[in-house]
Every structure is written in C-alpha cells, then in structure tokens.
C-alpha cells in the first residue's frame, strides 16, 4: 500500500526527500490530533499522510510552511541600536546640580565617554576586598 502511495505522491512532490519530510510532519500532526482529510481505512498515520498528499486534500506548500514554522526556534527582530548613554560626572560641580524645572531640562548638556575611556577607568578600579563569607 505504501509503495503505491509514494508513487502517487512523486507526481505532487518531485523530491523524495522533501516528500518524506512533509509526510512525516503531517503524520506527527495527525498523531497530535489534527483532523483527517481522507478516510483512515485501518492505515497508520504515515500512510494516511501520504494519501492526503497524493489526493491533494492538503497542499504540499502549506505543509512546507507549517514544517518551517514548527522548526523555527528564534525569530530575529530588527531593533534599533542603543544610543550612547550620557556619563554622569563625579565632579563636585556636577554633584551640586539638583533637579530643576522642566524648562531648564532643554539646556542640559552631558559629557560623553568613549569605550576606551571606560575601559581605562575600569582598569583603575581596585578589586573588592575578600571577606570571611566568601571562603565557604
């Protein structure tokens, strides 16, 4: 029964490898509870899937799209790149500046730090001191 079914399907899906992929995907869908589009006739799910493809009750293109969608684990979304974040200065003059009214917010300027400056600053940081709790 399966050999005749495969021969019928080769006319619909020319590549045997693709036919096997599509039929196995459809068989898994049937096992998961998808509705049948042909009579079962005591056939197992792979044979029913091949018969559905051969009788064109489901299209190979739809099955292919479903298969691709089921295999995708990550969908890449284009997001804009993050803008440079302003650096807060540790100078006494900057510390003296307090939040003011919203009209003054338009005139605020920030200092920017390059990546090299940031790396140099991180290198100059002292390592944290060890405590008794870290040894356990």
Swiss-Prot record:
Enzyme nomenclature, EC number: 2.7.7.6
Q: Does the keyword rRNA-binding apply?
A: no
Q: Which SMART domains match?
A: RNA_pol_Rpb6
Q: Where is the signal peptide?
A: none
Read off the Gene3D superfamilies from this record: 3.90.940.10
The record describes the protein's role as: Promotes RNA polymerase assembly. Latches the N- and C-terminal regions of the beta' subunit thereby facilitating its interaction with the beta and alpha subunits.
Q: Which family does it belong to?
A: Belongs to the RNA polymerase subunit omega family.
Q: What is the protein's name according to its record?
A: DNA-directed RNA polymerase subunit omega
Native source organism of the sequence: Methylorubrum extorquens (strain PA1)
Organism lineage reads as: Bacteria, Pseudomonadati, Pseudomonadota, Alphaproteobacteria, Hyphomicrobiales
